[in-house]
Amino acid sequence: STAKPESAVFGIVDKLLADGAPNVIKRLKMTATGVSETNEEPTILIPKRMELLLYPRRFKVFYGGRGSGKTANVVSYLIEKARFRNSRVGCFREIQNSIKESSYAELVDEINRKGHTQEYRCVDGEITHHTTRSKFVFRGLWRNITAIKGMAGLTDVFCEESENISQVSWDTLIPTVRAAGSEIIIVFNPNKETDPTWTNFVEPYIDKMVDGIYQDDDIVVVNVNYVHNPWFTEELKQHMNQMKAVDYDRYLWVYEGLFNKRSEEAVLGGKWQTLDFEPSPEWGGPYYGIDFGFSQDATTATESYVEDLGDGRRNLYIYRDFAKVGLEITDTP
């Protein structure tokens, strides 16, 4: 058999209907020159928020929290693209000590799920399409500069967990990917605002984004979260709500895709919530604590109680607290 001139049909879905059926608002095919609309029935479904993944761009950046379907949709796109066009795909992350730490398993699972097992050869950590000769390779970028520089000819690059990719790695990888029409797909959950991936690929465009999307002839940047995923699972929703209740800062980072404000030095970082309560007679306390502040440090005082939950677990309740900068010791309440 020979390679096809166009891809299968992608259905763009904005929501699920009451009966659970996807509401397909557009049907698209990838072609040799771009993307075209069709009336044919789709065989691949992707959320509306990820539609720009299908259109040619040098850089495609998708960032946000867990449950958005970022990685799953990129995997579907790359597998289908390799079925109709000869592709040499590099799947990278900053550190990859073994193939188990790569996206290899996700790609193989997608091949099996779509029933393409006869088309692909998946052996020894490499994936090859029998007809198009497309090939997927998996590497870590860190301390691998020579190997990466030797990968000239890559047509597609998929960078996962890109929040961890260093400036040195970007400076090595980007010039290596120089084939005509080559694409670099960057997927990540933001961590710190100083991370190179953020400063290179999102920060320059953040003020130009409209409804979380920026695009020009060279780059598309999309903020995508669980609210944009019609197939956000009930299990993930339960996990999200649990995290939101007990560890709000972590919830904002993991699911809302905001910066990680947690400090590992904070003993109770993310492990607190604000509630209305009255101390119970069974609780230990009251315990009073004070920390005298100097210069710009606040003087703080607390009245606390401890609830013994058993099994070595305890809840700490802060009933009253006070904090003020520039407080004279003689004025301490």
What is the role of each PLM region?
Residues 153-166:
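SF2 helicase catalytic motif II
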Residues 303-333:
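Nucleic-acid-processing active sites and adjacent nucleic-acid-binding tracks
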Residues 98-155:
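Inter-Walker segment of RecA-like/P-loop motor cores
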Residues 1-29:
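TOPRIM fold recognition
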Residues 164-244:
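ASCE P-loop NTPase helicase motor core
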Residues 229-293:
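ATPase catalytic-site recognition across NTP-hydrolyzing enzymes
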Residues 38-56:
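Pre-Walker A adenine-sensing motif
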Residues 71-85:
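Walker A/P-loop NTP-binding motif
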